[in-house]
Amino acid sequence: MHKDEDQRLLGPAPLPNDPDRSLRPQVLDDFIGQEAARANLKIFIEAAKTRQEALDHVLFVGPPGLGKTTLSQIMAKELGVNFRSTSGPVIAKAGDLAALLTNLEERDVLFIDEIHRLNPAIEEILYPAMEDYQLDLIIGEGPAARSVKIDLAKFTLVAATTRLGLLTTPLRDRFGIPIRLNFYTIEELEYIVQRNARLFAVKISDDGAHEIARRARGTPRIAGRLLRRVCDFALVKQAKQIDRKIADEALSRLEVDHLGLDPLDRRYLLLIAETFLGGPVGIETIAAALSEPRDAIEDIVEPYLLQQGFIQRTARGRILTEKAWSHLGLAAPASTSIQKRTQLSDAQDNVSLQTTLWDGEDD
């Protein structure tokens, strides 16, 4: 991920000074939002405890910052077992994975974040570990090489990914409990902001909490980060409490608008609007023009813009919606509807194709 993207105020990736570690709920009943996922996890955990067996392997899917790591830690606590954590890119060789797995005790939870970035060779070793609780390792090289099987404790693998499509089918099929996490509602985020403010011993009004929540991009981690920054403004201004005026002033100075868009989001929208007349435009072109990696655009910027209805993905590329033009305060082109622009683009392609065919006949 791009360095600048990593440090965005509204980036969902955790920052070193984020307050959310100390604010994380410790049990499922304290976890706010994700009602369906939480209810199902309660049942699965209770069933595993009743049977005195390891919980089936769990796969969390969803944008960053929605609570995948927190839910994994809560699961381990609810099960009364140890929790080990790592991430896909960190497991560089077979020995790294073997060291992790052989140190697990019965029913322990192993959390692997960004599992879609796991080395394919490591993934092959993970298959028998997940299915048969065995490690198949090759010791030595050449004619002297031999296969060694190591029995493992029955553990639970909890994995998280932001890009389900990058997981191979064999790996995806080995997870007995797939769970999708969605963006939070403003009401849920408002409750989280008020809860965090109490833990910070900071007074906040309902409209102040609402103002922070509606700019938090549906992400609890970002809500906590924005609350901390607004607290800084309130402290310096010697405000008795955080109200809507204080929150609006602080967040406006941080260039976070009323829908939670930051400068990178606006650059993205303006690029499509001004340079490409609203689209369609391909993701590679957008990434190159913004000097950002394609992965950062697809994983960090676009999910929220899609969820808010600012853009649409088509077979021909990204297209701005009426809502995006309105938010930017720009007049849309005459043929502004997505259908009209797509049809126009297809018609242009057909003309180009026919011209090429006629040129070929002339030759």
Curated annotation (Swiss-Prot):
UniProt KW keywords: ATP-binding, Cytoplasm, DNA damage, DNA recombination, DNA repair, DNA-binding, Hydrolase, Nucleotide-binding
Protein's cellular compartments: Cytoplasm
Region feature Disordered, mapped onto this chain: 1-23
Region spans: Small ATPAse domain (RuvB-S): 185-255
Region (Head domain (RuvB-H)), start-end ranges: 258-363
Annotated organism of origin: Bartonella tribocorum (strain CIP 105476 / IBS 506)
Gene, per the UniProt record: ruvB
Protein residues bound to DNA: 294, 313, 318
Protein name per UniProt: Holliday junction branch migration complex subunit RuvB
UniProt-annotated binding residues for ATP: 23-24, 65, 68-70, 131-133, 174, 184, 221
